[in-house]
């Protein structure tokens, strides 16, 4: 008796959530997925980058993909209800919803959606992401959007939370100049490499965050073929902007704040005009230890 094992759909050895092609985001929009180690500043980076794109005259949509649903609060200045919570209220009859029920306008016209997530230990985050995109398409809310940013939960790269990679053109990885952050980045590079076999997503580069220096990031980039697209030092104004529930573009324009604003504007311009798809060759765990962990 023989059996046949079909080739994995999303990269060799992976068993992942496959999105319905009917809910793909339309061609034309720049779609960016932001990943990185938990607590590294992805939501701050995503929100400020969304604000920067809007400053360049682009119509921007940010989708938070985290059960904490705190991705967009610096844009909206509040915690907004999640798509999954709103759908549950109408017993998942999406035709009963209006766009204003789940999409909220934030700073400088940035549109904000929080997908939310299933209760802890149940369900799949990838399903929630898919339902969010499906809902946006049903209401024709993606047709005039120039830039879509997915802000993704922590450094989880399972099939569910890798789902935004199936919609994205590019992935930006946020990291600090330390071993743990770079170790997580290496795992994310592996996930993107697997997805790139069957989807359009490519590595867009690295965002160095909360780091005075970038020597460890530079060593990793040189070894793996990555590139740093922006460098944000540990500036107190960025921390204070989170406490004030606002973007860096709404802070008093001190010298430090203007420098950060310009770096975000430069990152946005480069993602629009000057980004090169990176191949990215992840290291084995032991290789990272040898490269960064021990002298």
UniProtKB/Swiss-Prot annotation:
Binding site for Mg(2+): 43
Catalysed reactions, semicolon-separated: chlorophyllide a + oxidized 2[4Fe-4S]-[ferredoxin] + 2 ADP + 2 phosphate = protochlorophyllide a + reduced 2[4Fe-4S]-[ferredoxin] + 2 ATP + 2 H2O
Cofactor: binding comment: Binds 1 [4Fe-4S] cluster per dimer.
Residues that, per the record, bind ATP: 39-44, 68, 209-210
Cofactor: [4Fe-4S] cluster
Top-rank lineage group of the source organism: Bacteria
Broad enzyme group: oxidoreductase
Coiled-coil regions listed: none
Role according to the record: Component of the dark-operative protochlorophyllide reductase (DPOR) that uses Mg-ATP and reduced ferredoxin to reduce ring D of protochlorophyllide (Pchlide) to form chlorophyllide a (Chlide). This reaction is light-independent. The L component serves as a unique electron donor to the NB-component of the complex, and binds Mg-ATP.
Complex and partners: Homodimer. Protochlorophyllide reductase is composed of three subunits; ChlL, ChlN and ChlB.
Name by which UniProt lists this protein: Light-independent protochlorophyllide reductase iron-sulfur ATP-binding protein
Organism of this sequence: Prochlorococcus marinus (strain MIT 9312)
Lineage summary: Bacteria, Bacillati, Cyanobacteriota, Cyanophyceae, Synechococcales
Gene field: chlL
